[in-house]
Amino acid sequence: VSTKPTTTDLEWTELDQRAVDTARVLAADAVQKVGNGHPGTAMSLAPAAYTLFQKVMRHDPADAEWVGRDRFVLSAGHSSLTLYTQLYLAGFGLELDDLKAFRTWGSKTPGHPEYGHTTGVETTTGPLGQGVANAVGMAMAARYERGLFDPEAAEGTSPFDHFVYCIAGDGCLQEGISAEASSMAGHQQLGNLILLWDDNHISIEGDTETAVSEDTVKRYEAYGWHVQRIAPKPDGDLDPHAIYNAIEAAKKVTDKPSFIAMRSIIAWPAPNAQNTEAAHGSALGDDEVAATKRVLGFDPEQSFEVTDEVIGHTRKALERGAEAKAEWEKSFQLWRDNNPERAAEFDRISKGELPTGWEEKLPVFEPGKGVATRAASGKVLQALGAVIPELWGGSADLAGSNNTTIDKTSSFLPADNPLPEANPYGRTIHFGIREHSMAAEMNGITLHGNTRVYGGTFLVFSDYMRNAVRLSALMHLPVTYVWTHDSIGLGEDGPTHQPIEHLASLRAIPGLNVVRPADANETAIAWREILKRWTKEFGKGAPHGLALTRQGVPTYEANEDAARGGYVMFEAEGGEPQVVLIATGSEVHVAVEAREQLQASGVPTRVVSMPSVEWFEEQDQGYRDSVLPPAVKARVAVEAGIGLTWHKYVGDAGRIVSLEHFGASADGKVLFREYGFTAENVAAVARESLAAAQR
């Protein structure tokens, strides 16, 4: 096989082409072996993925976590073999047996790429469009990171300068989340982001003419992106030279994200399956796989054929990666020498440590005063923001309501934005009314590393964010969601804005910790605990959702046990508790008032505040039993939402004061009264439970 380059701009040899074709047959074989999967896109995209991994990206397969690396996101996650074949060829740790085990129990090659499971996979993708927003978040994080550590460096000269590459398919760009994120990227002028669109005109139901007719390239131009179209080769295959040249041109446009439309033919060069919807999501069949191998010059009788010459050639990526990293290390060391204080800060942040004495900055709120927990959260953020520079975030256009602004004078916006507070390295992110992409961008920001991000909206709009929140949990990402206006207590905006099912629904997501503090002091402790729990170590981190009130609620003495998720806020007087009242958030003060009535009538009553069911469940059985004694069968849970969470805690004799229907437009106090969230009703329900327990 000739190794002589065929052009001067891109060194591309016959051996490179053989490696691309090897990736194609590996994709076809892997799907054929397991009997299911998505071969077509992996076959047609092989030249683009190979060009990125072997010719373009700065990365070191031996150190997939290298800070200076370029990032790659496969938004079209169903085409996971596009990524797996390149990870194998480049030497990231996958071997041929891993490709043979594609989509099987315990393999390193699951059906869709999973972060933390396979080395070299930067994010979990599969739900279409999520990866586009993840990539936008990574590009945002790269800019903020540069602002933390090297803001004065000339463009392209900082060790913190790198690119984010994303491959997206037709489906990704049909999803609304990609429109939200792409609009954000254009507005932010993210010149470090390059998106390659696999324009193959095929979806599951056939040609994309079934559902789409707009000019996608013009749409991206309207978003403010730099756009290019590249034509395929005369035979229909993707042209590596055109891809390489387009990427090089994109890199030079530093004030816009770049969109490269690649017209492709799905499953190329399969003689019968190419350009058909059948090639999208099912095995080609033995005959078609054999026919494809003949077209490409492979032995149709062999499966998973990789020559020593090919793997020897592609594994040179390890040498190039080591050289690139060594070169980067020089510039990084020079930066460290010239910036010792920033270098110390970088070391602290990259270890996930917080500044010495940060906890002392947390506000302590005076008991008795009525403070909305959203307002308390805002005070906490402003206090912590002063000492934790890596903490940044914003809101989906509800900053004044969510109380999510650390610094009103510093907005994360391009330098030429007309607003006076615009700063490319600003503290406050204006996500816009784009809740779904906000959540996925926060995932990308967190995956990128070296910052801590939060984002806010109303709790009811967490529905818009749900798939991205689920992926936060699936990836164990320490993202913080600030969800305010958390119940009917928000009042007159009515049932469209009043969360009812949301708390229970969010608690149903495995790995998401929902925290609903009772008052200002619990809110401060919640933020402290969330920050202490922050870790990027896979499997140990977790996203948190803070559910905060619009309305003022009484402030109680701070109790450190709030960090354990549930604790005895007020103990029974006059003997062992006969009844336990369990409440969260704004309903805790209702339970406290009900306790006073019960105590006055001679019923020793304990009040348990349970800001986080998930944190409480982490505690040992002894602690949980000390809070909720098994011997006390009379229990009442009080929460202004559906009661699904509480059945396991109240037991057979227990009762739940909940809301099993939508709310109404009226003052929040009126709604609490009309729907039974009063001390009188809770006390009456407690007596019912007591009677049931004594039967």
Protein language model features and the residues they cover:
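Short beta-strands and strand-loop turn motifs
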Residues: 166, 196-199, 482-483
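Short acidic, Gly/Ser-rich segments with clustered Asp/Glu that frequently serve as metal-coordination loops
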Residues: 171-177
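Non-catalytic, alpha-helical, charged scaffold/linker segments
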Residues: 293-298, 303-324
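Thiamine diphosphate
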Residues: 2-163, 314-318, 322-543, 547, ...
